[in-house]
Curated annotation (Swiss-Prot):
Matches recorded under HAMAP family: Ribosomal_bL32 (MF_00340)
CC annotations in GO: large ribosomal subunit
Pfam families tied to this protein: Ribosomal_L32p
Biological process annotations from GO: translation
UniProt keyword Ribosomal protein, yes or no: yes
Family the entry assigns: Belongs to the bacterial ribosomal protein bL32 family.
Coiled-coil stretches: none
The organism's place on the tree of life at top rank: Bacteria
Protein name: Large ribosomal subunit protein bL32
Gene: rpmF
Paired cysteines (S-S): none
Biological source species: Halothermothrix orenii (strain H 168 / OCM 544 / DSM 9562)
Keyword Metal-binding in record: no
Amino acid sequence: MAVPKRRTSKARKRKRRTHWKLKSPNLVECPQCHELKLSHRVCPSCGYYKGREVVSK
């Protein structure tokens, strides 16, 4: 069975994990109510999408 020959150092381990991270959500301002919302989705506060009301609040 394969076993590591040397212990992985903290620096090597951390260099490997530099790309192991979460991305922040892509928030944009709603043109109707100026609240933050996810792009390409209906605004949860006013219900508008692409300039028209999709969900009545």
